[in-house]
Design a protein with these regions (language model features):
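Nucleotide/phosphate-binding catalytic cleft detector across ATP-hydrolyzing
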Residues: 1-119, 129-309
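Glycine-rich, mobile lid/loop segments that gate access to catalytic sites or pores
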Residues: 122
């Protein structure tokens, strides 16, 4: 059996050989079914699935997105099981499947850390969830999580720079940012060394390559400049301004959730784990427990399914 997490931008699969992350945007012509079929052909016999990609704006509503994802999986794995927001597995498309990936992670981790909490920061969002009172988490939609502070909509790759930072000091002058989608969090985090080539899996804002120079050029456009106009130092200042704002936003949310719940341990997963674990005095899941932190929901749903066997 394999574990599958279908996001709006990335498809994450965990099998016996490890973690596999595929850039697979659901708002375009998606090769979702074709990618999953490769694992069937490689010998996988079934799949345990979670999703959050039903929210992609290529779908009319969540129901259409859920049906699309379930159909894509069942083309290869007709007996696949899907974890829902009710904390149960399902075999058919239903509303409970919407955005249940984080709940699967919590359901798995709380068994080892009953008074802990999770920060799972990936390409697009940060899930910040205390494990205490698990029953209160059942049925919590993304909207409710936003209201509770358990979902912070920023990630290591896909957040537009101008959504969190509005200015940087360049050549000694405060320089406001344009609000065009010129650069993203992937560019800022790449330039500062928080991620590398393997982690920067999302499409770039200009469709060009991932390299230090390309990222610096995209960052420079944030202040309506070519890289030659503000130099590398200017572009790095833009990256630093963004990452400072992003880190404050996430760390403040973690601190509040921890204090409110009285949590004693913060478990950090996702591609942002190496950056954020030290900032929140947390435990990086991969190094501490061997859990595949880059694809935590896919790993978690697989383990939950195995416990049922």
């Amino acid at each position: 059996m394999i574990g599958i997490d279908v996001g709006g931008a990335n498809l994450k699969i965990v099998d016996e050989s490890g973690v596999h992350i595929h850039y697979c945007p659901l708002w375009k012509e998606s090769p979702l079914a074709e990618i999953i079929a490769e694992y069937k052909e490689a010998g996988a016999d079934n799949a345990a699935v979670v999703m959050s990609g039903e929210l992609a704006d290529g779908f009319f509503d969540k129901n259409e997105g859920i049906a699309f994802i379930v159909d894509a999986v069942r083309k290869s794995f007709p007996d696949a099981i899907f974890y829902g927001m009710d904390g149960k597995f399902h075999t058919e498309a239903c509303r409970e499947l919407a955005a249940a990936n984080w709940l699967a992670s919590v359901a798995y981790l709380k068994k080892q850390y009953p008074n802990g909490m999770m920060l799972d920061i990936g390409s697009t969002t940060a899930d910040i969830v205390p494990f205490k009172d698990f029953e209160k988490l059942i049925g919590m939609t993304d909207t409710l999580r936003l209201q509770a502070g358990y979902l912070v909509y920023t990630g290591m790759l896909r957040t537009p720079v101008a959504t969190l930072a509005s200015e940087a000091v360049i050549d000694g002058k405060v320089t406001p940012f344009s609000t065009e989608y010129f650069a993203c969090s992937g560019d800022a985090n790449y330039v500062l060394g928080n991620i590398g080539d393997e982690e920067y899996t999302a499409a770039t804002p200009d469709g060009k390559e991932v390299s230090r120079e390309a990222c610096l050029r995209r960052l420079a456009r944030t202040v309506c400049a070519d890289l030659e106009e503000i130099g590398e130092d200017g572009a790095v200042s833009i990256a630093e301004a963004f990452c400072k704002a992003q880190q404050k936003l996430v760390c403040d949310a973690v601190a509040k959730a921890k204090a409110d719940a009285g949590a004693d341990t913060i478990l950090v997963g996702g591609i942002g784990a190496p950056t954020f674990a030290p900032l929140v005095s947390g435990i990086e899941l991969t190094s501490a427990t061997g859990i595949h932190a880059d694809a935590l929901p896919a790993y978690a749903v697989l383990q939950l399914a195995k416990e049922m066997e």
